[in-house]
Structure formats: structure tokens, C-alpha cells
Amino acid sequence: MGVQGFQDYIEKHCPSAVVPVELQKLARGSLVGGGRQRPPHTPLRLLVDADNCLHRLYGGFYTDWVSGGQWNHMLGYLAALAKACFGGNIELFVFFNGALEKARLHEWVKRQGNERQTAQQIVSHVQNKGTPPPKVWFLPPVCMAHCIRLALIRFHVKVAQSIEDHHQEVIGFCRENGFHGLVAYDSDYALCNIPYYFSAHALKLSRNGKSLTTSQYLMHEVAKQLDLNPNRFPIFAALLGNHILPDEDLASFHWSLLGPEHPLASLKVRAHQLVLPPCDVVIKAVADYVRNIQDTSDLDAIAKDVFQHSQSRTDDKVIRFKRAIGYYSATSKPMAFHPPHYLARPNPFGMPGIVPPYVPPQMLNIPQTSLQAKPVAPQVPSPGAPGQGPHPYNLAEPALTLETSGKNLTEQNYSNIPHEGKHTPLYERSSPINPAPSGSPNHVDSAYFPGSSTSSSSDNDEGSGGAANHISGNKIGWEKTGSHSEPQARGDPGDQTKAEGSSTASSGSQLAEGKGNQIGTVQPIPCLLSMPTRNHMDITTPPLPPVAPEVLRVAEHRHKKGLMYPYIFHVLTKGEIKIAVSIEDEASKDLPPAALLYRPVRQYVYGVLFSLAESRKKTERLAFRKNRLPPEFSPVIIKEWAAYKGKSPQTPELVEALAFREWTCPNLKRLWLGKAVEDKNRRMRAFLACMRSDTPAMLNPASVPTHLTVLCCVLRYMVQWPGARILRRQELDAFLAQALSPKLYEPDQLQELKIENLDPRGIQLSALFMSGVDMALFANDACGQPVPWEHCCPWMYFDGKLFQSKLLKASREKTPLIDLCDGQAEQAAKVEKMRQSILEGLNFSRQSHPLPFPPPAALPFYPTSVYPRHFGPVPPAQGRGRGFAGVCGFGSPYGETVATGAYRAFRVATATGHCGAFSGSDSSRTSKSQGGIQPIPSQGGKLEIAGTVVGHWAGSRRGRGGRGPFPLQVVSVGGPARGRPRGVISTPVIRTFGRGGRYYGRGYKNQGAIQGKPPYAASAEEVAKELKSRSGESKSSAMSSDGSLAENGVVAEEKPAPQMNGSAGDTRAPSHSESALNNDSKTCNTNPHLNALSTDSGCRRADALEAAVLKKEE
């Protein structure tokens, strides 16, 4: 992209504009110009854009990032950085990108494609050479941004997160808070007249921690070399190509500037593909063109000249050209108002601007060449209203007319990070959560959301309406309503066109022209240089359920302060998230993609965030009281943008929120803000249930230390993957051994550790594990932070390099556990206990892979490309979702993740008995959630209709391993459905062993006995005989390994389970049917293993780590 290439152009072609500086000298207030000195007590205040600086805050491109991250090394570097800034009178404020930024989605799509290719290069390099990849392939370890954010909070460095438009909020925050400079690396900042602009890529801390250096960009020198007045930078930026008007739309214009005689003219169209000129050539040509513009205020004339070669969508391009000029004009001039969506916007939540009054920056000690007065680019005049840009791009959002009086709170509400570094529960932190009476300025108004939408598609009005529905609860249709020119009137910078070419041009022929390509209108084939450029396609989804205003206030407050996982605010207000690429081998089928592996976790988290369980329970109770049938609940759909094997990031996947079946999770307001002991326990239970780890051992510190809860939950979740086995015995031991190793807290020793040959599978396991940690942080924050954030940080339990060394020992040398623990018998005993806790109630008998289910049928509302792709073995469906499995014979290949909405008739038909089902086991749900063909059980079965046996069939051969007999299978048609008892935290799985594969079905303890019982009996004697004959069978089947069930959807055994990979000594604890937190409130409140909820309990290894890091830095 042209604008993004401008930063590299400065580095390469304007060396005089890049000046090295030492930040400590600037902070000391040395002589500047005529001898003025800065007051010594005034710190040098620098704003750091973390989005451009993550690799520097991580500690640089040292080679071991590929192993999953060396988090204690990063912690030591940040400790040294914080100490150097404190000693050098420098105040850092780190601004993280917490915005969804739909307006820049096409940039994200391109970036994900590049990172996906880089990931494959990394895997290939490690497989072929066994050495770390070069630093030019640096791919941030999973969860790196969140780990850096938590570490900065640990060292009392102020942080914040953007909420709508990251660049605008950073620029506005820098100006309105009196920061002396901005540390970043982005062309948008270079073109926005920042007073002092420093390079984030050049930021370096010396080894002794006394010198912090970087480079400063002198933009007036850049303007001098381009021979371009800075007042014309907005037009220059708009014509280079940007997120509003991409350079693909300007390709014809750029080629026309070069002319047919240019040496590169022959590259204009090659192999029927769109070819863009080199970026440096385009920058020089566009600078010459802008320099020669006679009247910069006549934007219509400029646009007419620029797009004279355009063959389609010219009106749309002109509109976006004007909007781009308005965007850069607004960010180039010093703001007399606060930036949008962040600082002093009329806030419906009763929250003040986050910043104090504007304080002009003081003079800095910078080279003499940079002291020249930098011209301020005034706003380009336009025929519009005063104070607006040439296009009505109004940052103040006049549509929001709420009063601003009475909205100021004290600054301490935004400075509530505990100084002691200890955990403070969410419900105890000060947040503006008190709702005001209706009619007051604090009253929530739905006008907040329509103006805040930045959807990149032409259905921007639906996105705004759907967001507004969170507050008002009004029902809106899926059809497009309202004027298409309304987003322009609001000045929404993110309004983009769809991939199929639809646009939001104002007036007249925009619909006919924009949609002509997709309705089959006879038109000439357009030139490649003028085809639609949106390389992503958005999808309209149903409106989200309303969310309590108190919850939204807390979510927005904590999101801005950087105290909450950013996905939470995105889900609550937008209903969509973006999932970054991780290191995965797409050529291998051994390991599933991280996006698919942890999708069930996200589905349950979505259900927690929207309080699905309680809302549906209330509705069912109300219908029961009124003697009505329970209503058909509309699915809650979340859009997930991700890129993995077989899935392009250009289209989102529609994922349905799920609720826990066996217990009713409280609503989000109570989960976050409740102060009772029961509420604390429900938070922990909700978190464990999301991670499928609701077992008593997880809360027993004798088995699982408190600071290792997240580690064990993630490993247990990975072990339960129903497809191909993810973790082998030695790999699980390697994870546990490195977490208990004393070397984990010695980053200097780890730096000296030599890895002879990197294991490709090891680096992929590390990436999968860190993806699980990422999702655990998401689930923990969504459930009210039951696990203290200090115990969630990965430096407490993981180091990628140490894991590689342990894995090489365990897998290649077949090292015994005692040797894997460096001869420490006590450490080996702890590993044994943790392994038993993780594997409690799980069964790992070898089975053949099931046949993939048929693909789901396409719906009229959703294109086929949005549905999940097949990848490896098929996991069971989770929860009571309403997926495509409602159609007989079809099932979702990765569980019930795709919503239906149009196939409700099929679900009703299934529930009323039009499809056969296993008798006694909630037949409607079984048939809905399990599609495909059932394999023949080993003991045969019989078919009954209305209680009469009409057929028998023989069984297949018994599976290998000497498994016990499976109960006789009975397929019943026409019998009454039986209910299902509560008491287990998640859905069990029945596995049928043999050559026929396996079938995933829902069941419970006595299902083997109940399945054999006919739905009708002819006489009392038959009933007596049946009960007598079944009593013994039920006892044996309940104790059999194939029939006994455990929690979390896996088969359990009362006898010791078989060893993983045939290793000896891996005994398991017997399965338990109760959850970690009993339903009885008395038992729940007196549980002695709940010290994870106490701030004064648990292991003190975190304190040891902090002391070690600080001592090492002193």
C-alpha cells in the first residue's frame, strides 16, 4: 500500500531526515537553542504505539521466539526498560491496539496472508535445517501483545487500549495529553504533523540499561526533499493509496503518471493480473503531481482528473477520495476537540474523557536541525460547513447530542491498578458502574452505537443497527433499511464496499452500478485496473441480544484502561473478532489448526457473555407458567475472521454461542459484579467449564498449584481433543517438567542453553499451547477473573526454549521422568500428581479415525464459503447448539458452530420423531447434534417400533485391546423421549469400539441400562422380568470401561486407564461424576480447595520470580 510504503521511503531515500537521539539526554533538559532549559522535575513524556513496537518491547529479534516465547526473558527486559525510564526521568505511556477496525479489514486480510506464508516458511526451515529461522521471518509468538500488556501493568507502566480507530485515537491522545513525542513506525503518523516523531523500530536499550536510543524523523526535511508543501500532505496521502482508497483503485492513475515511455510501462498488465508500480516510483510521481495542482480546494476537479481513466465505480472512488482527504486533514491539524470514540465524546455511559486538560509540550533537547518551525497543515477548505473537511467527515459526531454535564469523575477511577501488584477481583475495582435514573445525562442512549460503527462493507447501516440493539433491545430485520448515503452524512470513515462490488455512493445509480456485476447484467469485461478491490466479504448476521448498561460501562472502562481482554468488548458491541495466524504446518494432518481447536472454548465464552443459559431458562419458565410451548430461540451468531488450512481470511465464519447444559450460569452482571461467596465460586466454575476442566483436582493445590491452574486447564483441554491425539505422554511430561523447573526463573541460564536441533512438532505444540493460554485469558476475563491475573501470565509456567530442551530429552533419548526433572525426586512426584489431575477420568484407547461427515447444506442467507472446512477427525458436537445437524444425516464437521435460522422446520421435524434416535437418551438432541451414519456396535442390536421388536442385527468384531462388552444397542422409533438428569458439568461421549470407527453421542451414567428398556410393555409380568434381567446388566455395563462416563465429554473408567503410548507408571485417578464446585451452595462455600479465589493464598512462586527479575536488574 502506498501510504504504508512511505515510512520505508523515508528510511531509504531521506537519510538527512532520520536523526539518532538519546532519550536520556532529552529528558535531562540540556541546553536547547538560546539556552532555555526544561524544568528538571518535568519528565519526558512519550507515547508508545505498541502495535508498531511489540518486537522491541519483547526484547528484540533474538532467535528463540520460534519456540513459543521466552517470557521470563521478556519480563527481565521490560523490568530493565522500566527501571531505565524511571532513572532517566522518562515517562512512558504504551497504547495498545484494541480496536476491531473494520475499515482496515482489507489491510488485515493482506497481512494475514503474508504471515501465513511466513509461517509455512518457518516450518519448512526448521524441518530442513533444525535451526531457528532468520529474524526477517519474525512472527510474533501467540499472545505476545497481551503478555506485554500484563508485564507493563506489573511494572507500573501506564497502558491504554484503543476502541474504534487506533491511529486517530493515538494521535488525539498524544496531542490532548501534552506528550512530548510519539514512538511509532507507521506512515499515517508521519503524515499527521506529530510534533516529535520517534522510530519504534530503532528503539534500543543498552545492555547495562543506562542508555535508551532511537531515531527521530524530521518531517520538514522530508517535505524539503520531496519539494512538497506540508499543507498538501493530506492530498498526497489520499493519492498514494490508503485504507479508505486503496492503491488498487489508483493503479490506473499511477500508471498514467509514469507515462508510456517509462521503463516500467511494459509491466502494466502482465499475465492478466493487476500489477502495481514500485512504491518509491509512485511516491515521487504523486509528489510531482500534487506539487503542480493549481487549486487544492477544488476537489471535484482534482478527482475528475485523477479518475479520468477509471472504467467503473467512478462516483464511489470520488467519494472515498474526498473522505481520505478529510481523514488526513483532520489528523494533520492540532485538534481543538478530542478524538472520536475515546476522549471527550458525549458518552452515554456517564464516563469522562480519560485525559486531563491539554498541556502544551515543553521544548526538548533535539538536534538544531529539528528546531525549525514545522508548518502546520491547515484543513483543506471546502464548500462544506465550517470546521469540517472537504468531505463531511466529522470527528465530533453531531448525531450524538447527549449532554455532557455531570459526566466528570475523578481521575482515580481510571488509575485503579493495584500498586502492590496483587490481585484485586473485578467486582472490587472502582469502575463507573452505578446506573443513573432515566432521563439523567448518564442514561444509556442507543444513539451511541450507530455513529460508532466502522463496518467496511456496504451494509454499514445493519451493523449500526445491530450494535444499537445491544442497548435498546429493539428488533431489527436482516434486510437493508435506510438510505445508503446515511453513513456519509455521518462522516463514517470506515464505510467500504463489498467484494462483489456494491458501494455506498450518494444518490442515483450507486445500487445499479455497484451490484451490476453480481446480478448478471450484460456488461463489457472491465479492465483489470478498474475491478473491485475489496478482497473480503462481510456477512449480515442476526442482531445480538441486549446487554445490561452496567456491564457495557464496565467493559468499556476496563477495555480503555487495558485491564480486559479486547475480544470481550468486540463481542459485546460488534459481535465479531479477528484471530491472528500462528505457526502451523498446513502440510500435516497430525495437529489441528488453533482456530478450530479452541473454537468450543470461544463458543461457551460467547454464551457466558450474552447470558444465554439464564435468559433461556427464564423464557422456558415463563412459557411453562402460561402453559405454552417453549419458544424457538434464535441463535446468537459471532463472526470470526481467521486464516488457517483450507480457510481464507477474506470471509468470516459464523459461530454460534453455546450455553452449559448441566447448570445454569448466572448472568454476566452478577458474574462480574456479584460479591457473594457463591458468585466467586460460580466464576471459577464457569471458567473451568469453558476450558472443559471442571474436576475437583483442578482446585486442589496439593495436586495443581494455584499458579499452574491455567497450564493444567490448557493441557487437559488439548488432551481431550476427540480427533487425532495432540499430546503424547512424553510431550505432556515435558510441559509439566519445564513448568516446575527452577531454570524457568533464570533467563540468563536459558540464554546459554543450547538446542542442538529444533523439533518441528515441538514448535507447533508450543504455538498450540500459547493459543490455549490466549483463550484461557479470554475466558478468565469473561468469567469475572476468577484466576488472579498474576497467575495467568505465561512466565509463571512456560518457556519455549526450556520446553524444547525437555521435549528433546523426553522424545529422543527416552529419558525417565526422574532424569527429565534433573534428578529431583520431589519435582518428579509433583509432575506425577499434576499428570494424574490432568488425565483424571480420561480414556485414550487407540481407535480408528471416523469417516468425515457430509458437508452441511448451504443456506440462503450464508454463502457456502463461510462454513467450516473439514480437517482431520471430527470432534463431537458441544452443548445444545442449533447447527446444521438438525437435518437428518448431516452434521457440522467441527461441532455445532454454524447457525441455521432457516432450517428450524427441520429441527422441529427431528424433535417430533421424524428421524430415528437412540431410545432413552434425549432422542431429539441426539439426532440433532449427531449426523452421519452410526457404526454397528460390537454386540449387535435390535430395532423397535412402538415397543415391538421388528428386527435384529449382528455385531462386528470386538475392538483391539480386550475392551469390555458394550450394551446392546436399541433403536426405537415412536417411543416417548426421556429426560436427562443434571449434575455433570459437560457432555459425556459414548464411544463404540471396533473396526467400524466411532460414533459420538450424548449419554449419562445409566444410559446402557435405559437404552435396552423398551418404551412400552405389554403386561406387568414383562415389566418385572425386564427389570430383573436389566438390573444385573446395568451394574456390569456401568462398571465396564466402554459404558462408564466421565465429565467433559470423554469416556472414563473405574479401573486404571491404559497408559499413554504404552508407558508404564501412568496410572489415573478414578473418574468422578461431580464437578469441581458442587451445586450445593454450602458445600461450594466450604470447599477447602478454593484458595485460587483468595488473594492471600496459594503458591508464592510469583513473588520469587519478581524478586529474581528485580534482583537481576539491580
UniProtKB/Swiss-Prot annotation:
Highest rank taxon of the organism: Eukaryota
Span list, region RNA binding: 825-1114
Main location: cytoplasm
GO CC, one annotated term: plasma membrane
Region of interest (Interaction with YES1, SRC and FYN), residue spans: 339-402
Biased composition (Low complexity): 929-940
Subunit structure: Interacts with PURA. Interacts with YES1, SRC, FYN. Upon tyrosine phosphorylation, interacts with PIK3R1.
The protein's name in its UniProt record: Constitutive coactivator of PPAR-gamma-like protein 1
